[in-house]
Amino acid sequence: MRQGVPTIINPYDLFALEEALQVRDRYGGEVTVLTMGPPMAEQALRKALTHGADRALLLTDRHFAGSDTLATSYALSQAVAKIGESYGAPDIVFTGKQTIDGDTAQVGPGIAKRLNLQQLTYVTKIVSIDPTSRELMVERHAESGTQMLKSTLPCLITVLEGVNAIRRGSLDDAFRAAGSTVLKWGAADAGIGELTKCGLRGSPTVVKRVFAPGPRAEKAMQMDINDKTLAEVAADTVTAIFARQPVLERKLTSHGNL
């Protein structure tokens, strides 16, 4: 149910927006913000304009209802391609690392795949961009540490949270946003010809219900570690675990792991 619920910009996308604005301020160009959603999503796009974006576009159509990440990435990729035809091909497509509702982190890479763009995920810093050679260097967060990656333009970058300080936007930006027209495209406007790839028809996954998990029936157990060595605490912990999971103890014992 969306009725009565205000729309917001996905928090991770705010960092992507700021990164795009910084690139524009340093190297020139324009920043176009794009989202897919119901008509009420216009207010979130207008908020992006107050931060300094040059253009806002809402992809909205009944054909998009019920889209999963596969259908969403298809529709957005077609819209990005159409934006390229109308306003010039983008050198960099920025997205947040993921959305706060689905948490899949699949849409950004999905767009890159469909548009045949180089993709740089979990980026923490854009080190440099060379407009002449059309190359850029970024820092990327990885489980093993930080990676330095070099890529060519055009590319798609998914941005991690906390990589920048999101600007408030000037008073002029606020007035401009209030008077700006948020472009609205339906499926036909975006050049989407294969409607079977959109919405529920184009979605292999279907959300049956969304719910908040209830509290666990099991209670946490507080252990007394006063005057005990680390070895004794470890032994007590293992004993407590095996008391609650005897099957685990039998399996470990039978395999000679204890």
Where are these regions (language model features)?
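A glycine-rich helix N-cap at a beta->alpha junction
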Residues: 42-79
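Histidine-anchored nucleotide/phosphate-binding helix
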Residues: 13-24
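Residues at the starts of beta-strands that form the adenosine-phosphate
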Residues: 28-32, 55
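Glycine-rich phosphate-binding loop signature in dinucleotide/nucleotide-binding domains
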Residues: 80-90
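Short, glycine-rich nucleotide/cofactor-binding loops
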Residues: 2-15, 226-228
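Short Gly/Thr/Asp-enriched flexible loops that form oxyanion-binding sites at enzyme active sites
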Residues: 102-117
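Conserved acidic residues
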Residues: 54, 91, 154
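Electrostatically charged, flexible surface regions
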Residues: 125-258
